[in-house]
Amino acid sequence: MHYYCISFTHKNTDIATREKLSFSNEDKKRELLKLIHTNNKILESLVLSTCNRVEIFLFVGDVESINEHILKTLSLLCGVDRENLSTKADFYEDSGAIHHLFSVASSLDSLVIGETQIAGQLKDAYKFALQEQRCGVHLTRAVHYAFKCAANVRNQTEISKNPISVASVAVAKAKELVNLENKTAVVVGAGEMSELACKHLLNAKAKVLILNRDIQNAQKLCEDLGENASYESIANLKEALNQYEIFFSATNAPHAIITNDLLEEKDYSRYFFDIAVPRDIDVKANEKNIVYAVDDLEEVVRKNLTLREHQAQIAYSIVGTMTNEFFQHLSKLATLPLVKQLRLQADEIAKEQLQKAIDKGYLKHSNHEEARKLIRQVMNAFLHHPSVNLKKLSGTMQNDSVINAMRYVFDLKNENMEGLNLYKCEFNLENNHEI
């Protein structure tokens, strides 16, 4: 049994390919999970899809042919050449997969180190996989331990102090290019990323105009944001594009919604910040139309990374420690029941043989208790060293091999996973809602 991860991120995959691999649509994500499980070696799966990454976390019976199956599935579903995907993807197995999961949850692998959105996105991905019955006890334990790791990183470092996001980085870039004070910035969309962009724009003393298909959502967001926020229907997009100078877009549209044909020629510059994947903006960049997509914000991100580099080193140390702790935790979950089963089996055999001895007259019934105590002492003495050594093996590389051998030799069933409640895990999501 193995943990496994196939990863496409801003580090290894261009935005054009990430657009095609986007699974923000639940129906598309559901179809991907269904196709993933056509390989019977894949026991559990979870798909995390954001503007900067697509991560496929798996628990598999055997890693052989898993890469090929996943790459072919993605190629078929997303229309991307399989060889192209193969050269871009990063593959992680066992401790590498868990270390990567913990790093992602702790925002150490994000475009913006320390951003606070990723944990919520991982929660949503986990809940969806659970709802679709694709995520079982193994990934559940890993994800919940990832939340524990993220909480430790947050509490023991300052990496998320003055939390930032892709939206805040985009606004910071806008502030470098133009004085935002008293300017009206148009924000297309009313989701989480748009809300963050609005808040940062308002903090920069700009005014915001929200354009959205769902007027009620836009109205509610404006009420939360205050008097310097207004809203209109997205039907007014063309008019807004030719009236204002600064635009931020973060919708879940499957195709571009701001295109060249909507733009009239102007004698002033317009600034477009596309913080969506797939991209919302398909405008030809020139001296009058300045366009920034997610991957164009690297310069601001590098400044952020430099400021947080020391805290990131501390955070990676925590992730490494938590990765080791996780596998030790799993080893104990396997080892302790085995020790208990050994003792129970020995006790049952002792009881059975003692009763046979009494029934056949080899032992007087009046001596039953004394004989029982003697047998228990012999049994405890015999099992002492195996029990101690099994506990010592917990967390080591040999642990699984020895446990499997012991189960085979003594014909012990693996009852550790039976009756486990997926909703009652070691680290409950509800207790970590603030991550």
UniProtKB/Swiss-Prot annotation:
Catalytic reaction annotation: (S)-4-amino-5-oxopentanoate + tRNA(Glu) + NADP(+) = L-glutamyl-tRNA(Glu) + NADPH + H(+)
Species the sequence originates in: Campylobacter lari (strain RM2100 / D67 / ATCC BAA-1060)
Family of the protein in this entry: Belongs to the glutamyl-tRNA reductase family.
The organism's place on the tree of life at top rank: Bacteria
Pfam families per UniProt: GlutR_dimer (PF00745), GlutR_N (PF05201), Shikimate_DH (PF01488)
Miscellaneous note of the record: During catalysis, the active site Cys acts as a nucleophile attacking the alpha-carbonyl group of tRNA-bound glutamate with the formation of a thioester intermediate between enzyme and glutamate, and the concomitant release of tRNA(Glu). The thioester intermediate is finally reduced by direct hydride transfer from NADPH, to form the product GSA.
Name of the protein described by the UniProt record: Glutamyl-tRNA reductase
MF terms in GO: glutamyl-tRNA reductase activity; NADP binding
Keyword field: NADP, Oxidoreductase, Porphyrin biosynthesis
Keyword Transcription regulation: no
Function: Catalyzes the NADPH-dependent reduction of glutamyl-tRNA(Glu) to glutamate 1-semialdehyde (GSA).
Record NCBIfam families: hemA
Gene Ontology process terms (BP): protoporphyrinogen IX biosynthetic process from glutamate
Residues annotated as binding substrate: T50, C51, N52, R53, S110, E115, T116, Q117, Q121
Alphabetical list of HAMAP family matching this protein: Glu_tRNA_reductase
Residues of the site described as Important for activity: H100
